[in-house]
Amino acid sequence: MGNTVAMILAGGQGTRLGVLTERIAKPAVPFGGKYRLIDFTLSNCVNSGIYRVGVLTQYRPHVLSKHIGIGRPWDLDRKDGGVEILPPYVGRHESDWYKGTANAVYQNLEFLEENDAELVLILSGDHVYAMNYNDLIDYHLLKEADGTIACMEVPIEEASRFGIMITDVDGRIVDFEEKPAKPRSNLASLGIYVFNYEFLKKVLIEDENDPNSSHDFGKDVIPRILRENLGSLYAFRFDGYWRDVGTLRSYWEANLELVLPVPPFNLYDPNWRFFTHTEEMPPAYVAPGSKVSTSLVSEGAEVYGNVFNSVIFQGVKIGRGTVVKNSVIMTRTEIGENCYLENVIIAENVKVGNNVRMGVGEDAESKLDPKVYSGLLTVVGMNSVIPDDMVIGKNCVIGIGVRPEDFKSKTLESGDYVIVREE
């Protein structure tokens, strides 16, 4: 099949995830009890036998770079191949920042040359899915295509969120439009591409020299290939589980799908394991008299209260008399005694005091940003401390690093927020 090199686009900010991505890149956002989003793409690579991987970082890369390290959890700590972090080339003329997804790959053509790339797999580092990339590559080779895009049908009312394509009866793409206001199809790009390297190199150099381009695959490169008939592009239809968790609602829903009696996404398949960088922790502990129902509780967690339909990450502590429902509680968060939390997302290293009620009261629109904070979820940013006896309504936002003295009273009405700005 030729020498395949994977390029994982991992520089996205993920602004629609609000405080969850204020300090970390979207691919570094925790998911599913112990993972980070990029773990799924990295694991798909090694499960597909692809061991030459570049991770293109940009926005707040520290946590992501530390998480990946030399790639040992994914068996990518190799002398031949392996994983390499590829930040923008600081110091190069006008190149201190990747200008778009296509420019990010263009800036790393040298990396592809050094790895003798014949096929280039371009992937997003912030989606949740399991895919054998060999199926995509085999289809690409069968069609003798210059490029192939993985796609799936989506509800037509959601199609405007995606790159949308139209194909002929043979699967060849005849038209592509990025996030159209009035989509003419519901066949959506998954942001997963495979290209013949020499073809990709040619079109990226041409795109880089186009002053009118924003240097993005979906907005510029793919439409231009089709418009100017530069090569053949085919659509590979994927029928497995794939989720874009780019909004708080979709992130929350995808986590809670993991606790369904028959989850649509299987974390437990021994033939397709997902790997991550994690510290060793003891088994989870559920105290006598506590109740855990339809939930995922990760190692190191200590549950002294009651947990229903929730995802509890590693090292979380839940106090006596506390009830947690329909919630996502991230690593090393501690929740005190006699609390009630419903429909909340709490980031890492948060401390919630005793007798706190969160996610309660009347429905209300967010006063901070209704486009980001909706669906009546209350969200707490990392490293915050919620004082005892607080009552926090629905659709509230507690920012990063908030302290007890930042709360003006013991009640935060639905839709309200407490944010501490960085100096």
Swiss-Prot record:
<feature type="binding site">
    <location>
        <position position="189"/>
    </location>
    <ligand>
        <name>alpha-D-glucose 1-phosphate</name>
    </ligand>
</feature>
<dbReference type="InterPro" id="IPR005835">
    <property type="entry name" value="NTP_transferase_dom"/>
</dbReference>
<dbReference type="InterPro" id="IPR011831">
    <property type="entry name" value="ADP-Glc_PPase"/>
</dbReference>
<keyword id="KW-0548">Nucleotidyltransferase</keyword>
<comment type="similarity">
    <text>Belongs to the bacterial/plant glucose-1-phosphate adenylyltransferase family.</text>
</comment>
<feature type="binding site">
    <location>
        <begin position="178"/>
        <end position="179"/>
    </location>
    <ligand>
        <name>alpha-D-glucose 1-phosphate</name>
    </ligand>
</feature>
<feature type="binding site">
    <location>
        <position position="98"/>
    </location>
    <ligand>
        <name>alpha-D-glucose 1-phosphate</name>
    </ligand>
</feature>
<dbReference type="GO" id="GO:0005978">
    <property type="term" value="P:glycogen biosynthetic process"/>
</dbReference>
<dbReference type="InterPro" id="IPR011004">
    <property type="entry name" value="Trimer_LpxA-like_sf"/>
</dbReference>
<keyword id="KW-0067">ATP-binding</keyword>
<comment type="subunit">
    <text>Homotetramer.</text>
</comment>
<keyword id="KW-0547">Nucleotide-binding</keyword>
<protein>
    <recommendedName>
        <fullName>Glucose-1-phosphate adenylyltransferase</fullName>
        <ecNumber>2.7.7.27</ecNumber>
    </recommendedName>
</protein>
<keyword id="KW-0321">Glycogen metabolism</keyword>
<dbReference type="Pfam" id="PF24894">
    <property type="entry name" value="Hexapep_GlmU"/>
</dbReference>
<dbReference type="InterPro" id="IPR056818">
    <property type="entry name" value="GlmU/GlgC-like_hexapep"/>
</dbReference>
<dbReference type="Pfam" id="PF00483">
    <property type="entry name" value="NTP_transferase"/>
</dbReference>
<keyword id="KW-0119">Carbohydrate metabolism</keyword>
<comment type="pathway">
    <text>Glycan biosynthesis; glycogen biosynthesis.</text>
</comment>
<keyword id="KW-0808">Transferase</keyword>
<dbReference type="InterPro" id="IPR023049">
    <property type="entry name" value="GlgC_bac"/>
</dbReference>
<comment type="function">
    <text>Involved in the biosynthesis of ADP-glucose, a building block required for the elongation reactions to produce glycogen. Catalyzes the reaction between ATP and alpha-D-glucose 1-phosphate (G1P) to produce pyrophosphate and ADP-Glc.</text>
</comment>
<keyword id="KW-0320">Glycogen biosynthesis</keyword>
<feature type="binding site">
    <location>
        <position position="163"/>
    </location>
    <ligand>
        <name>alpha-D-glucose 1-phosphate</name>
    </ligand>
</feature>
<dbReference type="InterPro" id="IPR029044">
    <property type="entry name" value="Nucleotide-diphossugar_trans"/>
</dbReference>
<dbReference type="InterPro" id="IPR005836">
    <property type="entry name" value="ADP_Glu_pyroP_CS"/>
</dbReference>
<dbReference type="GO" id="GO:0005524">
    <property type="term" value="F:ATP binding"/>
</dbReference>
<dbReference type="GO" id="GO:0008878">
    <property type="term" value="F:glucose-1-phosphate adenylyltransferase activity"/>
</dbReference>
